[in-house]
């Protein structure tokens, strides 16, 4: 062997040694990443892992073996090729796993603002003196208590100010607008939280922020929901709550509480591929789980107090445990629809709504349309132009979800899947673990199998649910005003609960004993909860007594079963101690009604009447003297009709109580 050949052999052995180590390292990386794909094609995974492991063993034995006189260049090529393959396998899995992990945001940035009225003289934190400031009394609330307490401590606000604890933001806001409170700590999403309430439409200009503070926190530290279902297997029936957030933020890395603009509760049975889908009206009047005493209010207001409050409220009302949730904001929906290259839906009429940034208006035309992201947002958000308002919007949201599912099930390209993940991961948040998300692969696989063996277009049988109810104008105890609420029908709610529990295999199916159809009428799938029902349910609300006479008010009070007491006499009711439209079951004690004919008014009337009677007597006496022919004509007599009229009674009349 020549000197040159020896030198070439040493170089070749060196590269073989280096690439052997690289091959083993990349193979180990690939094996680790493949192990992460638990419960996905287990047999194939184990075969691949076995092949990679065996190859690594041979490479190690090759390195440890006796030196051969001749090293083949083909072996070096194999090592390079093997390293590239292993690196690509591991890299793709690493990327997908990382994107899926980012959907479950372990940490969120919360922001709390110290808010005051624009007319307040304070312009910065140093000006905050001799003020009454409100905070939430919920010690687990990052934006209502935890961060405010830090601001108070850092700026020594307790030294010169009074800190008052409240149960809810709305009561604080009412007191601040009513000048009973100088400032309040609230989430930086306060505009979207309150601008939809009558009287607070201009909250953005009515108020100003004195100081803001951000704090990044682990969600699990403030929420029990985050880890409640971490060990559940998605191969078993489960529930998931989809929440559409009224937020224009690009991502959900920053906490987006705002209003629960869209609430869709889904139960899914992976064994049967049956699902139920319920759109919960945002104005549903239900008990709010995180408020003291659990008073009824609009369900959308629960969103301002975090995921736990919203989820617990829905769980308790529908008597069903929610295993998972998924949140998406406006930007996320736009990105998702664009990522799947648009969706096909039927648009009933021309609809126009602001875009996701609220910068310009976007319109969609009637008919079967292929919509892009911004257009799909119009389809999902618009309600004011629809004949059935909110309920029409809920129907559109369900149709959009099904359109997205139909597009997603046709994706077979890994590159496209990675593109979608990359596009929407920042705008999604969930408590599903990465392992649980990966388990949906098997669900998708079952759907594909069914599609190959069936001509049925509906591969997943979706049973629509509808919460029937009636609208009522009810006095809001916290907002101190009358608001429109949607009062659910109890029978509808009962049927919905039964349907969800049946799909979750928690109760036995109810047998259908009656069925009818007609060849003259096409079959329509029944919507559970829609009714019709023989009876509805509404609350008895206190009437408006103003403008009624005492007798009319007494009769109306008797009709409504309330006790009233009157102050003053005569005239009509000008004031009542309890607001109209308040629920009568919330009223304790007597309702005081003030009549327009008060003591002073009655005395003035008596005085005028006496003066008029005296004038009449004087005129008659003059006529007698002038005539002197009328004798003792006493037909006029002493007109005592004025008399001592004591209808005014005491200066401080006691109320009369009538039932």
Cite the ranges covered by each PLM segment.
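Internal/C-terminal transmembrane anchor helices
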Residues: 71-95
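Short, Lys/Arg-rich cytosolic juxtamembrane segment immediately N-terminal
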Residues: 6-10
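Cytoplasmic membrane-interface regions of multi-pass membrane proteins
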Residues: 61-71
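Hydrophobic alpha-helical transmembrane segments in integral membrane proteins
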Residues: 89-107
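Short, Lys/Arg-rich, polar N-terminal cytosolic tail immediately upstream
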Residues: 1-5
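Membrane-embedded alpha-helical segments of integral membrane proteins
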Residues: 11-63
